[in-house]
């Protein structure tokens, strides 16, 4: 064998040995018996029976205090010296108070004379957040869990709008979706076809099994006095410290790796992750490719740590290297953190200019892991988990208004980076990003291209077809949207959302026979979606099934009494189809109590005032509608009628001219204007 062949052989051998060390065989990873899907969860009380000391310590941590009934919360908020919070974008004031032992949040509006013209109250049923940094409050109505608009920010000791509300104020109606609840609480009985419906009561905080996996097998083995130990490992329950590097990281990353958007693998949801498996087998987490170097979110610990040279140069640095999850972080001594750094960075061997700050009693974290505001949560002081050299750290300014979107961003899968990206998952991510974050059409164009090409190669992708339908629908291509939804249903005949979207498309296209049947199929698969019931009411009404439409609107309201649109729609049916003026008026008032800026309810109230010859209120409601949309033609029509009846003919002419300018084909306005000129 010549030297060249020997060199190639040796090189190849070294490569194989290297691969054996860097890519461990998955079959060598210990298998924990509680990974089996048949093993059930038992709850923290079972754990506490044997592990009382650990349990009593854990319930004092941020995770152990992540979600709890509002009545059980130790008062740390200031309910007396709290000035109202004003949302100038929407002209609402907010205030939190204690009323008969309940935490109540109030929304109100005042007019130019200082008179209160709107008020809405909601009781906080649960607190979300440990109080280490903030407390946010949620209310539960018929199982629908919704966020309240004010948060107590502990670091600044102040009330302010809840995270995200400075940009988009969803008032009392922001849904707490499953993925959000999953990382703030233990395992819930969530209704999968809903957006935010849970079977109550809800658990009280993140529990032991979130990090250790389901405990039934472990508990039963102890009851049966079975010795499952092999060496130091009990394979009936996961202890994260015995997991391989990536699986150990993933236990924490299930919640501490936020990203921009997550997309679940086919047939997976949050609860399918169990400690001991890889997180990427359950979901893909997408990041912004070109994000600002030192901008971080409140749940970006893993992402930021992964950018650290300490992490990149180590095969053993994980979250629990520095954190004991059973002990409140405030009880970790500064020395304990320093010792972890000194295990690799002995001061004697450091080549540094600043010797004074690199003694054994120095504070490594203070200099190398700076604290500051986050990009998504206002008024907090949080530790950046990217370990850096102080001289190169450049803090990014943080706005309480959250991110200001300009040009579209590029998303990249955290786990795969740009290597072999899953185009279907990425396409879904762009559609969801458009719907939830940034309404820029380029996301939809990119998603359609990705999904079309990938689905031609692998068409058995239910979520891929559904989101392709959504992308087409959102771009106005209703024909291709319908085709994609039918592909979705071909693969999942019980896909309630696809049937609901087919109903919406049929309504838009005035296919009045098809629309009701599509909504019925959706309701048959899942009967608790108020939006589908409301749309079903539309379809029935347009098909002249008035009584059935009335029942559908009523069902929507019974499911969600906060559903302003359903009140308005039922009111219109009662007023215009059944001449039930009083009942219609009550529904419009209920709508306006929930949404004082509901332009159609305001218009309907002005019409009722006209019927009752109450010209003053007819004018008032019409003018109020025009403050919301100055081009709202129906309100000008009401004003023209009011002015004409009052003999204010010049004003009537001006308003009619405005109508014609906005709607050149409005023959009625032209006819009335011509008659007034004569």
Put a short name on every predicted segment.
Residues 611, 637-641, 645-678:
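Terminal, low-structured helical/coil segments at or just beyond the last alpha-helical repeat
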Residues 462-463, 496-497, 530-531, 564-565, ...:
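Helix-start (N-cap) detector for alpha-helical repeat units in TPR-like alpha-solenoids
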Residues 428, 470, 504, 538, ...:
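Residue-level recognition of tetratricopeptide repeat
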Residues 25-31, 38, 53-128, 136-141, ...:
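Primarily the internal scaffold of c-type cytochrome electron-transfer domains
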Residues 473, 500, 507, 534, ...:
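Position-specific recognition of the canonical hydrophobic site in helix A of tetratricopeptide repeat
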Residues 440-449, 475-487, 508-521, 542-555, ...:
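Structural signature of tandem alpha-helical TPR/SEL1-like repeats
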């Amino acid at each position: 064998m010549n030297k060249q062949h020997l060199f190639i052989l040796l090189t190849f051998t070294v490569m194989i040995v290297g691969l054996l060390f860097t890519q461990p065989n998955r079959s060598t990873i210990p298998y924990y018996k509680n990974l089996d899907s048949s093993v059930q969860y038992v709850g923290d009380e079972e754990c506490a029976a044997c592990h009382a000391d650990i349990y009593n310590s854990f319930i004092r941590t941020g995770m152990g205090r992540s979600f709890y009934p509002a009545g059980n919360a130790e008062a740390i908020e200031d309910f007396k010296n709290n000035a109202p919070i004003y949302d100038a974008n929407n002209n609402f004031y907010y205030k939190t108070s204690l009323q008969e032992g309940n935490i109540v949040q109030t929304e109100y509006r005042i007019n130019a004379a200082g008179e209160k013209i709107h008020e809405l109250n909601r009781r906080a049923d649960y607190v979300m957040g440990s109080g280490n940094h903030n407390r946010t409050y949620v209310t539960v109505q018929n199982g629908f869990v919704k966020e309240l608009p004010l948060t107590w920010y502990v670091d600044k000791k102040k009330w302010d709008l809840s995270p995200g509300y400075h940009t988009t104020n969803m008032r009392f109606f922001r849904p707490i979706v499953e993925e959000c609840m999953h990382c703030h609480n233990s395992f819930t009985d969530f209704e999968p076809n809903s957006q935010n419906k849970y079977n109550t009561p809800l658990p009280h905080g993140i529990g032991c099994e979130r990090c250790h996996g389901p405990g039934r097998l472990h508990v039963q083995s102890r009851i049966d006095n079975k010795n499952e130990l092999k060496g130091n490992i009990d394979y009936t329950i996961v202890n994260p410290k015995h997991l391989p590097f990536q699986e150990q990281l993933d236990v924490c990353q299930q919640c501490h790796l936020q990203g921009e958007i997550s997309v679940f693998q086919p047939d997976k949801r949050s609860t399918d992750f169990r400690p001991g498996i890889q997180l990427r087998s359950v979901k893909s987490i997408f990041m912004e490719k070109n994000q600002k170097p030192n901008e971080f979110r409140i749940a970006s610990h893993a992402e930021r740590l992964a950018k650290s040279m300490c992490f990149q140069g180590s095969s053993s640095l994980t979250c629990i290297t520095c954190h004991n999850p059973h002990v409140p972080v405030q009880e970790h001594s500064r020395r304990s953190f320093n010792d972890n750094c000194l295990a690799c960075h002995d001061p004697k061997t450091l080549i540094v200019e600043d010797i004074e700050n690199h003694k054994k009693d120095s504070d490594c974290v203070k200099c190398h892991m700076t604290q500051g505001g986050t990009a998504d949560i206002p008024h907090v002081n949080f530790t950046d988990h990217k370990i850096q050299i102080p001289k190169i750290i450049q803090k990014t300014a943080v706005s309480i208004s959250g991110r200001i979107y300009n040009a579209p961003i590029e998303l990249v899968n955290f786990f795969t980076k740009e290597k072999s990206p899953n185009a279907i998952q990425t396409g879904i991510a762009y559609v969801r990003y458009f719907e939830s974050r940034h309404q820029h059409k380029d996301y939809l164009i990119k998603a359609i291209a990705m999904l079309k090409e990938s689905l031609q190669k692998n068409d058995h992708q239910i979520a891929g077809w559904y989101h392709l339908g959504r992308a087409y629908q959102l771009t106005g291509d209703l024909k291709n949207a319908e085709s994609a939804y039918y592909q979705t249903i071909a693969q999942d005949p019980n896909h309630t959302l696809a049937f609901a979207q087919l109903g919406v498309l049929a309504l838009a296209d005035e296919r009045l026979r098809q629309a009701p049947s599509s909504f019925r199929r959706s309701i048959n698969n899942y009967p608790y979606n108020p939006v589908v019931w409301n749309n079903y009411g539309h379809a029935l009404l347009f098909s002249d099934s008035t009584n059935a439409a009335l029942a559908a609107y009523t069902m929507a309201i019974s499911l969600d009494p906060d559903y302003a649109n359903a009140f308005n729609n039922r009111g219109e049916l009662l007023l215009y189809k059944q001449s039930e003026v009083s009942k219609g008026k009550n529904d419009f008032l209920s709508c306006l109590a929930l949404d004082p800026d509901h332009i159609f309810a305001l218009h309907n109230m002005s019409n009722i005032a006209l019927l009752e010859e109450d010209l003053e209120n007819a004018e008032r409601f019409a003018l109020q509608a025009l403050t919301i949309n100055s081009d709202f033609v129906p309100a000008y029509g009401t004003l023209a009628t009011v002015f004409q009846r009052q003999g204010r003919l010049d004003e009537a002419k001006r308003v009619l001219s405005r109508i014609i300018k906005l709607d050149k084909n409005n023959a009625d306005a032209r006819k009335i204007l011509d008659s007034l000129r004569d």
